Amino acid sequence: MDESYQLRLIENPGASRPVGEVYLFSFLVHPVFVAVGHDIAWLRVTGIVALAATAAWTCSEAMHLCGVSDMSSSGLRRSERARTVTAMACASAASMLVFTLGVRVPGYRAVALLGLLLVAGGLARYLTRSRRGGPLLVGIGVWLTFVGKPPSAVAVAVVLLVMLSARRALSVRALGQGLAGAAVAAVVTLLVARLSPADALRYLKGGARLVSLLGDHSSLPQMLGWSRMEVRGLLVFGLPFLLVFAGYLVFSRDTMRDPARDPRVVGALNAVLVLLGLGTGVLGVRALGAVGQGAQALSVTLVLGLFAIAGAAGVLVVGTSEGGFGQRARHPADLRAFLVVLCVLPWAYAVGSNVSLTFSMAQAAVFWVIVLVAVEARSRQAIGGRSHWSALSVTGCMCACLAASVTWVSLHDGRSAIPPPRGAEAVQVLGGSVVLDHDTAVIGHALRAAAKSERMDDRTPVVDVTGMGAGYALILGGRPLGRAHLYGTWSGRVPSARFALSQVPCPDRATAYVIHAPSNPSDVSPALSVGATVDVLEDYDTVLEFTSHQYDKDWRMALLRPRPTLAAKLGCPGAVR
C-alpha cells in the first residue's frame, strides 16, 4: 500500500501541489527517478547504494572519534583494516532495515534515515580534533531529515541542542555553520521543487490538514513516538536466540583464557554461530509470515538497542582512560555524549510515525549497530584484542543479521515470498516492469490493455477510491488527483479524501477515471461528491471489472470512465480530456 502510494507521489510530485503533503521528499527523489528512466528496480538500487554508503561513512567517522585508526592511514595493519571494513559492512547491512514494512523504494522514511546518518557523521567530525565540516554536515542532515519526516527533524534538533549545550560543546561558530548548511540545503530543495518558501509552507500546511482529517495520528504521545510496543517477534526468537548467545559466551570465555587459539578456528566458529542466528531469523520470519505477522519479527532489534545502551553505559561508567579511549575527541566526555545521541536517534526517527514504536525504531537500528561496533573495535584494539566488549559486539552483529533478514524475507502480508512464486509474470509499470504472482499479473495486463484502448497517458487523471492500496492505479498510469492515494484505513477517510478532491479543478474531477471497490465498506467513493452528489453507478461507465485477492478476501473492483453528463453536474460543462 505505502510503496505504491509513494511511487505515485515520486512519479508525479506536482500533482499534490493543490492540496499538499506532510513531507517534501518526492520533489528530491523525482529527479533521481527520471535519471534512472522511471525504472522502479533502478530506483531501489539507487536508494540501497546511497543508504549503505552513507551508513558506512558514518560508522567510519564514529570509529575514528573512538580512536580506531582511519581507513586512509598508511600504517593501518591488516587486522585493523579488516575490523574497520567489517564494522562498516555491519552498519551498511543494518541500514537496509529501513526498507522493511513493504516499502523498498527510497521514500520518506529512507530520506529521513539518510538525513539522520548525515547528522551522526557530521557530529562525529565536529567532536573530533583536526576534522572540519562537521557542523555544515549536521545542518544539511537536519534539513534532509525534515524533507523526509519533519517531526523527526525537530526531535533530532532538540536532542542535539540539549546534549551539546549540557556539555558546553556548542559554539556560536558551529551553530552558524550548521544553520548555513541547513539554509543551503533548503535553497537547493526549493529550487529543485520550484517552490517559494511561502509555497512550501502552504504545501506542508495542506498536508497537515489532510493528516488531521484522516485521523491516522490518534494522540500526542503517538506523535512523540511513544506508541504501542509489539514484542511477539522477540518472544518467538527468545529461546533460539538465547541458545545461540549462550554458545557464544561459552566459546568467548574459553578464547579469553587461551589467546593463542588458532584464529582460523575462532573465525570458523564465529561464522557458524552467526549463520545459526541468521537461520533462526529466517525460519522465525517465515513462521510468523505464515500467519500474517511477518512484520512482528522486527521487534528482535530491541536486543540491539539493549546491547547498545549497555555499551554506551559501560563507557559512561569506566570513562575514557582505558587505552586512550576517545583520545581524538575535543574533550573525553564528548565521546560519551556522542554515544548517547546515537542511542537516542532511533527514537528521533520514530517521532511522527503512525506505526508501532517497535517497528519504527527497528528501521533505524543502524545507530545501535554503530555504537556496538565502534565501542568494541576500540576496546579490543586498546587492550590487545582481549576485550569484554567482543561478546556484546558479535551478539549485536548477530542480531543485525537476524533483523536484516526481515528485509529480504519479510512476509508482512502472509503470502509474498523470495524468490517469486511459480507462474509469476512481469507487468509493465512506468519505465520498467514489476514481477507479480500470476493472478495479480493477469489483472495488471488487463489494466494496461484498458489504458491503451482508452488512450490514457501520463496526463490522464486517475482516482483510486477503493480504500486499499494504490497498486492498480500505479499500473494503470495517469496522474493522481489531490493526493497520490486516498487511504481508507482510518475513520476520517471520507472527510480527508473529500478535502483533497475539493482542492483540484472541476474539469480534472469531471474527466478522471475511477478505480472502485463496491464490495469494500471502507471505500472512499462518497468523497467524489464535491459540489454535487456523484453516484458511481449513474455517472460512470464500466471499462473493466476484476476480482482482487487482498487481506485474505476476494474483492470486486472496477475501472470506471466518467460520462459526459458528469461535467455539467459538477458545474464545469464542456470539460473534456
What are the language-model segments listed below?
Residues 1-8, 16-32, 38-41:
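Extracytoplasmic catalytic/substrate-binding loops of multi-pass membrane glycan-assembly enzymes
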Residues 45-81:
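Transmembrane-helix motifs of polytopic, lipid-linked glycan transferases
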Residues 98, 111-129, 134-142:
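Specific aromatic-rich, kink-prone transmembrane helix
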Residues 102-112:
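Short acidic/glycine- and proline-prone juxtamembrane loop motifs at membrane-interface regions
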Residues 125, 155-187, 221-222, 250:
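Perimembrane helix-loop-helix junctions
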Residues 133-150, 156-161, 182-189, 342-351:
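Membrane-interface alpha helices of multi-pass inner-membrane proteins
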Residues 404-491, 511-523, 549-552:
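Short periplasmic/luminal acceptor-recognition loop of GT-C membrane glycosyltransferases, typified by
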Residues 511-577:
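Aromatic/acidic, Gly/Pro-rich catalytic loop(s) in extracytoplasmic/lumenal soluble domains
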